[in-house]
Amino acid sequence: MRTPHAIVLGGGGLLGEAWMSALLAGLEDSKEFDARRSACYVGTSAGSIVAASLAAGLEPGARLGRLPDLAVPSADGSEERETAFSSAFAAAAKLAGAAATPLAPLAFASTAAGGAMLRRAALRGIPEGRRSLEELGRQVELSGVSWDGRLRIVAVERESGRRVVFGAPGAPDVPVSSAVQASCAIPGYFRPVKAHGRTYVDGGLWSPTNIDVAEVDGGQHVLCLNPTGALRPASRALTGAIGTFSRAVTSAEALLLKNRGAIVTTINPDAHSAAAMGGNLMDARPRQAVIEAGLAQGRRLAAEEQRSAA
């Protein structure tokens, strides 16, 4: 696989971040693929961490030994973490109806005004989170990343329910570290980011990947990694509905880019990666297994590309 013009990195909690970093590291087995040379990065929630590290010039594998400050593994806290993670998608999941009504999430994402109203209403019912993401912000600052024109970080403005794309022209002026914290601020669990009199929370509330933010022209390649695309209806009702929502919305947004002539490749976790991830993407315990599965998936994809090009 050649280096794409744009890399889009979706939400997916602790394990999604690990899978994306590992998969990109595996893809770099291909001599023509260098994730640090793309012209555009779009990061949502956990994907904002990976996007910022790539924009900083760090190799994808550089993050595999580090645990981002998103969760503290403990046996008695897993249910609380899962509930907090799921709440960010609850409104969309209810509309998806656990795959019974596949067109509902498309309507939810594509009608900006209606979608913003639904998000605003849902956020009103969720108390502000208390856990800090300041350590994550410090990690981002230490990477030396800056707004160099390539990076886009997605969050949602809590007051209006609308999407905000930090790094884009006209967006609020905040440091990259603050933008990443905002994009990762799962409502009800993490403390939201406040800037310029507004409050910002997890960008995954708008879309699992926000692939339509990618700035591309006809013929340019967009690579989208969607960690939540592997959550299936066969699992518990809510996580299955999240997976349905994730795949449907990402497909709808990708179609917008394809209509502009872009070439879009979306990668979801394969069967081995999905099995390693399970249904709780904030549980740190299977992280090493997810890394190994992601690396293997990336290397397999790189090998397949090399064989097809031969």
Where are these predicted regions, by residue range?
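Patatin-like phospholipase
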Residues: M1-T44, I49-A310
